[in-house]
Amino acid sequence: MSEKGRLFTSESVTEGHPDKICDAISDSILDALLAEDPCSRVAVETLVTTGQVHVVGEVTTLAKTAFADISNTVRERILDIGYDSSDKGFDGASCGVNIGIGAQSSDIAQGVNTAHEVRVEGAADPLDAQGAGDQGLMFGYAINDTPELMPLPIALAHRLARRLTEVRKNGVLPYLRSDGKTQVTIAYEDNVPVRLDTVVISTQHAAGVDLDATLAPDIREKVLNTVIDDLSHDTLDVSSVRVLVNPTGKFVLGGPMGDAGLTGRKIIVDTYGGWARHGGGAFSGKDPSKVDRSAAYAMRWVAKNIVAAGLAERIEVQVAYAIGKAAPVGLFVETFGTEAVDPAKIEKAIGEVFDLRPGAIIRDLHLLRPIYAQTAAYGHFGRTDVELPWEQLNKVDDLKRAI
């Protein structure tokens, strides 16, 4: 295609994908610990394979009951996803659960508990007391492609993945199984989405289901058409979509029996579908003292409010931290030529309106709550099915006043 015209593709996966099972387990453990002790420090990684779950990491907590009950938390989440029988390749009630969790490193804890600003610089502000849990760079992004200010390819891929799960769980298509993937390719002209080009839907199913006679027509009618009918987009042509359903022919063997899964292997699915840059840090299983998670949420909050305020049509913001320091060491703003005001003014307004110290992010977004398991599948940003604090548009007026 020409420079003005291009195709862009994003993918999503269902909650029964092996990697997403792991994200869900890690975040369910996190939520259970935070519910009992909001100050829990948690870094939990999960691996699943045929008949087995391995949970490892570092936890410092006063949540004795939740910690002792981790094995049951694991099993309950697997069963809720839909793996409840050996006939489906995995059973949360009978799988092996191995737990190997130690305490958070005291070397890391000292920098988080007492930041460089307090230890070395003598700062007195309470929000200077909490240092970043690690070094790193985090990105936030927003674009006016959709009402939720997300890139359209990933937004549509998530809607299809959620719909796959809905029709499985509510009995519309009872022969579907938990594992599945969606992929959306959209044609753009001058950065405007103009045509839905290709949709790929791969879904695990019961044995004996005919692809051509049953599965493909059902997926088109009950999943794709339903999502497209609900899609409100002025410029997108959906009249000639190429649809590929289970292009391997069948998908009976899935879940942890088909592939091993790990926490944190779907970071592009979790964020912006490849449309924006990524700092590399995964989210699931991490408490908000880890800026990989909390600062990425904060930067989405920043970006979304900037676009909603009309300061740019799309924006990417980067923040960077040093371990043990409260104040960010870097902030970068990219508006891709869509700004309504000087980007330098936008950057200055960010500094005036948003406090990006970890303690302030946790305070302003109320992050010491058990809200994370609901983010483990279908994206952390632009969610239309759950309310998340970093999606609120509560800084629009403040930004306008600051410009």
Swiss-Prot record:
<comment type="subunit">
    <text>Homotetramer; dimer of dimers.</text>
</comment>
<feature type="binding site">
    <location>
        <position position="282"/>
    </location>
    <ligand>
        <name>ATP</name>
    </ligand>
</feature>
<feature type="binding site">
    <location>
        <position position="19"/>
    </location>
    <ligand>
        <name>Mg(2+)</name>
    </ligand>
</feature>
<dbReference type="InterPro" id="IPR022636">
    <property type="entry name" value="S-AdoMet_synthetase_sfam"/>
</dbReference>
<dbReference type="GO" id="GO:0006556">
    <property type="term" value="P:S-adenosylmethionine biosynthetic process"/>
</dbReference>
<feature type="binding site" description="in other chain">
    <location>
        <position position="104"/>
    </location>
    <ligand>
        <name>L-methionine</name>
    </ligand>
</feature>
<feature type="binding site">
    <location>
        <position position="286"/>
    </location>
    <ligand>
        <name>ATP</name>
    </ligand>
</feature>
<dbReference type="GO" id="GO:0006730">
    <property type="term" value="P:one-carbon metabolic process"/>
</dbReference>
<feature type="binding site" description="in other chain">
    <location>
        <position position="58"/>
    </location>
    <ligand>
        <name>L-methionine</name>
    </ligand>
</feature>
<keyword id="KW-0479">Metal-binding</keyword>
<dbReference type="InterPro" id="IPR022631">
    <property type="entry name" value="ADOMET_SYNTHASE_CS"/>
</dbReference>
<feature type="binding site" description="in other chain">
    <location>
        <position position="290"/>
    </location>
    <ligand>
        <name>L-methionine</name>
    </ligand>
</feature>
<dbReference type="GO" id="GO:0005737">
    <property type="term" value="C:cytoplasm"/>
</dbReference>
<feature type="binding site" description="in other chain">
    <location>
        <begin position="179"/>
        <end position="181"/>
    </location>
    <ligand>
        <name>ATP</name>
    </ligand>
</feature>
<dbReference type="Pfam" id="PF02773">
    <property type="entry name" value="S-AdoMet_synt_C"/>
</dbReference>
<dbReference type="GO" id="GO:0004478">
    <property type="term" value="F:methionine adenosyltransferase activity"/>
</dbReference>
<keyword id="KW-0963">Cytoplasm</keyword>
<dbReference type="GO" id="GO:0000287">
    <property type="term" value="F:magnesium ion binding"/>
</dbReference>
<feature type="binding site" description="in other chain">
    <location>
        <begin position="265"/>
        <end position="266"/>
    </location>
    <ligand>
        <name>ATP</name>
    </ligand>
</feature>
<comment type="pathway">
    <text>Amino-acid biosynthesis; S-adenosyl-L-methionine biosynthesis; S-adenosyl-L-methionine from L-methionine: step 1/1.</text>
</comment>
<dbReference type="GO" id="GO:0005524">
    <property type="term" value="F:ATP binding"/>
</dbReference>
<feature type="binding site" description="in other chain">
    <location>
        <begin position="250"/>
        <end position="251"/>
    </location>
    <ligand>
        <name>ATP</name>
    </ligand>
</feature>
<dbReference type="InterPro" id="IPR022630">
    <property type="entry name" value="S-AdoMet_synt_C"/>
</dbReference>
<dbReference type="Pfam" id="PF00438">
    <property type="entry name" value="S-AdoMet_synt_N"/>
</dbReference>
<feature type="region of interest" description="Flexible loop">
    <location>
        <begin position="104"/>
        <end position="114"/>
    </location>
</feature>
<keyword id="KW-0547">Nucleotide-binding</keyword>
<keyword id="KW-0630">Potassium</keyword>
<comment type="similarity">
    <text>Belongs to the AdoMet synthase family.</text>
</comment>
<feature type="binding site">
    <location>
        <position position="45"/>
    </location>
    <ligand>
        <name>K(+)</name>
    </ligand>
</feature>
<keyword id="KW-0808">Transferase</keyword>
<dbReference type="InterPro" id="IPR022629">
    <property type="entry name" value="S-AdoMet_synt_central"/>
</dbReference>
<keyword id="KW-0067">ATP-binding</keyword>
<feature type="binding site">
    <location>
        <position position="259"/>
    </location>
    <ligand>
        <name>ATP</name>
    </ligand>
</feature>
<feature type="binding site" description="in other chain">
    <location>
        <position position="17"/>
    </location>
    <ligand>
        <name>ATP</name>
    </ligand>
</feature>
<dbReference type="InterPro" id="IPR002133">
    <property type="entry name" value="S-AdoMet_synthetase"/>
</dbReference>
<keyword id="KW-0460">Magnesium</keyword>
<dbReference type="InterPro" id="IPR022628">
    <property type="entry name" value="S-AdoMet_synt_N"/>
</dbReference>
<comment type="function">
    <text>Catalyzes the formation of S-adenosylmethionine (AdoMet) from methionine and ATP. The overall synthetic reaction is composed of two sequential steps, AdoMet formation and the subsequent tripolyphosphate hydrolysis which occurs prior to release of AdoMet from the enzyme.</text>
</comment>
<protein>
    <recommendedName>
        <fullName>S-adenosylmethionine synthase</fullName>
        <ecNumber>2.5.1.6</ecNumber>
    </recommendedName>
</protein>
<keyword id="KW-0554">One-carbon metabolism</keyword>
<dbReference type="Pfam" id="PF02772">
    <property type="entry name" value="S-AdoMet_synt_M"/>
</dbReference>
<feature type="binding site">
    <location>
        <position position="259"/>
    </location>
    <ligand>
        <name>L-methionine</name>
    </ligand>
</feature>
